[in-house]
C-alpha cells in the first residue's frame, strides 16, 4: 500500500487528494466477495434470483435466505456482509410499514429505496462508524408498475430494467446487456436469469440451489419452491 494512501484510508470522513474515500471503496470490495444476485423486469412484474452457496455441509441449507420480503409487494436481495444486510432489511421493513400505515396505499418503492440509501450514505460521512459492506437490489410493484432499483455502500441508487450485484456482477451484466429483452413472459425471464447466473460461474462450478422470487401486478410476493427451481436448472 502506498504511503499516501495509508494516510487517508483509516479516516472515513477525509477525502484523499485525488477525491477518493477509501473506506467506501473497501466496502464495495466486500460486496464483490458476496453471492451473485440479479433482478429483472418482465412482462407484468419483476423477479429476483440469487445464487446460494452453502459453505459447509453442516449448515442447514433452508436457513440461508438471500431474498428478503420487505412488504407484500416489495422484496430485496443482498450481497456482502450478512449482518449489515440484516440491519438494512429490518430498516426497510419498518420504513415500508410506516408509509403503509400513514398513507394506506402501496409502498412507493423509489421513496423506500431513497430512505435506505440515506441511511447508508450517513455512514460515509461521520466519524466513529464505517460504511455498510452490502449492496441491495429492491424489486416490487407500486402505483407506477414494476420497479427495480439497486443501492450500493455509498448510498448511490439507480433504477434498472435488469441489474446484478455480488462477485459475478460484471459477467451477469455483460450477459444481460446482450440477451435481455423487455416484456418477456415470466418463465422466459426466469430461464434467462438462470443462464445469466450460470455465466458468472467458474469452470467446474454448478448452480445448485438458487433462490427465485417474483412479484407481479395484482399478485403478492412469491418465492419459488425447490421443485419449481429444479425445472429451470
Swiss-Prot record:
For the biological process aspect of GO, one term held by this record is:
proteasomal protein catabolic process
Matches recorded under InterPro entries: Ntn_hydrolases_N, Proteasome_alpha, Proteasome_alpha-type, Proteasome_asu_arc, Proteasome_asu_N, Proteasome_sua/b
Domain of life, per UniProt, equals Archaea
What is the name attached to this protein's record? Proteasome subunit alpha
Q: Reported effect of changing residue 82 to A?
A: No effect on PAN's ability to stimulate gate opening
- Species of origin: Thermoplasma acidophilum (strain ATCC 25905 / DSM 1728 / JCM 9062 / NBRC 15155 / AMRC-C165)
Q: How does it assemble?
A: The 20S proteasome core is composed of 14 alpha and 14 beta subunits that assemble into four stacked heptameric rings, resulting in a barrel-shaped structure. The two inner rings, each composed of seven catalytic beta subunits, are sandwiched by two outer rings, each composed of seven alpha subunits. The catalytic chamber with the active sites is on the inside of the barrel. Has a gated structure, the ends of the cylinder being occluded by the N-termini of the alpha-subunits. Is capped at one or both ends by the proteasome regulatory ATPase, PAN.
Keyword field contains Transit peptide: no
By sequence similarity, the record places it as follows: Belongs to the peptidase T1A family.
Cytoplasm found in the keyword field: yes
Cellular location(s):
Cytoplasm
Miscellaneous comment in the UniProt entry for this protein: The configuration of the closed gate contains an opening large enough to allow rapid entry of tetrapeptides but able to impede the entry of proteins and longer peptides.
Q: What is the role of this chain? A: Component of the proteasome core, a large protease complex with broad specificity involved in protein degradation. The T.acidophilum proteasome is able to cleave oligopeptides after Tyr, Leu, Phe, and to a lesser extent after Glu and Arg. Thus, displays chymotrypsin-like activity and low level of caspase-like and trypsin-like activities.
What result follows from mutating residue 81 to A/E/G? Answer: Prevents PAN to stimulate gate opening
Q: How is its activity regulated?
A: The formation of the proteasomal ATPase PAN-20S proteasome complex, via the docking of the C-termini of PAN into the intersubunit pockets in the alpha-rings, triggers opening of the gate for substrate entry. Interconversion between the open-gate and close-gate conformations leads to a dynamic regulation of the 20S proteasome proteolysis activity.
Q: Name one GO molecular function term.
A: endopeptidase activity
The record gives the effect of mutating residue 66 to A as: Prevents PAN to associate with the proteasome and stimulate gate opening
Q: Which residues form a coiled coil?
A: none
Query: What keywords are annotated for this sequence in UniProt?
Result: Cytoplasm, Proteasome
Its cellular-component GO annotations read:
cytoplasm; proteasome core complex, alpha-subunit complex
Q: How is it modified after translation?
A: The N-terminus is blocked.
UniProt cross-references to HAMAP family, sorted A to Z: Proteasome_A_A
Amino acid at each position: 500500500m502506498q504511503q499516501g494512501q495509508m494516510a487517508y484510508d483509516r479516516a472515513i470522513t477525509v477525502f484523499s487528494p485525488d477525491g477518493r474515500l477509501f473506506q467506501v471503496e473497501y466496502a464495495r470490495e466486500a460486496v464483490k466477495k458476496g453471492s451473485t444476485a440479479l433482478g429483472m423486469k418482465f412482462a407484468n412484474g419483476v423477479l429476483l434470483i440469487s445464487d446460494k452457496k452453502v459453505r459447509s455441509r453442516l449448515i442447514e441449507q433452508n436457513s440461508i435466505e438471500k431474498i428478503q420480503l420487505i412488504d407484500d409487494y416489495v422484496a430485496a436481495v443482498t450481497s456482502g456482509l450478512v449482518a449489515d444486510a440484516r440491519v438494512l432489511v429490518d430498516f426497510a421493513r419498518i420504513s415500508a410499514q410506516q408509509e403503509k400505515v400513514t398513507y394506506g396505499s402501496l409502498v412507493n418503492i423509489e421513496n423506500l429505496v431513497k430512505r435506505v440509501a440515506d441511511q447508508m450514505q450517513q455512514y460515509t460521512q461521520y466519524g466513529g462508524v464505517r460504511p455498510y459492506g452490502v449492496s441491495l437490489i429492491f424489486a416490487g410493484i407500486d402505483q407506477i408498475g414494476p420497479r427495480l432499483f439497486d443501492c450500493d455502500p455509498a448510498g448511490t441508487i439507480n433504477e434498472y430494467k435488469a441489474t446484478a450485484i455480488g462477485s459475478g456482477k460484471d459477467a451477469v451484466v455483460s450477459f444481460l446487456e446482450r440477451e435481455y429483452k423487455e416484456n418477456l413472459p415470466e418463465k422466459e425471464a426466469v430461464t434467462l436469469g438462470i443462464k445469466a447466473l450460470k455465466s458468472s460461474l467458474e469452470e467446474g462450478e454448478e448452480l445448485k440451489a438458487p433462490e427465485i422470487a417474483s412479484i407481479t401486478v395484482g399478485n403478492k410476493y412469491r418465492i419459488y419452491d425447490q421443485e419449481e427451481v429444479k425445472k429451470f436448472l
